[in-house]
Amino acid sequence: MARVCLDYGHGGVDSGAVYKGRCEKDDNLELGLKVAGELRRHGVVVDEVRDKDVFVSLKDRSDFERKNDYDYFISFHRNAFKPEKSKGSETFIYIIGSEKSKELAKRIQTSLVGLGFVDRGVKTANFYVLRETKSPAVLVEVGFIDNSEDNKLFDSKKDEIAKGIAKAILEQLNIKYVETSKVLYRVMAGSYTIKDNAEKQVKRLKELGIDAVIIESK
């Protein structure tokens, strides 16, 4: 069974980058939780370094990952530079990253660019969580938090971004993405020519905790 470790950057007293009252830690958590939900829906075991607004040190993050064997480690972040001066997404792997991490990074980056982010490419870096984790690792910067256009894109397409990242991970795991069904199926529990009998059946169903209504047809 596929198993991944998701790391939502910053948290608690560590806000990460801040712009006009907007905190990176919150964006990272919100997006990451959505990705986790999509992966779990497809049967992937997901362990999260944090699932609420708490501080976790870099060492504790890597220690958490090293306790188990994961197919991949994915760290979520948002970038920052000078207000309104830079924009786009970029995805990082370790300076001597594995082929698997490179493949996943390319899939994630392609997905984000397809949703409208400027392509800043797949890059290498000596980031702690990439260096000190043992599984193939990537760190994704989902746009610049100090760029209004990137924030608008992040907010308006949050679900699509989460879905795109999840699809990239699933593709890397050779798991087919399945769309959620919007079809509703109604169950009939009988047809009666006498209204009193229909009302009795509705009463029985409601006593069992089943929502039921009478629909009259001719």
What are these regions (language model features)?
Residues M1-A2, K218:
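Short, Lys/Arg-enriched, disordered terminal segments
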Residues Y19, K152-L153, K200-L205:
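Short, polar loop/linker segments at the starts of domains and inter-domain junctions
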Residues V178-K218:
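Solvent-exposed beta-strand motifs enriched in subsets of small alpha/beta binding domains
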Residues A2-V4, V13-D14, R22, D26-T180:
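Active-site-proximal helix/loop segments of hydrolytic enzymes
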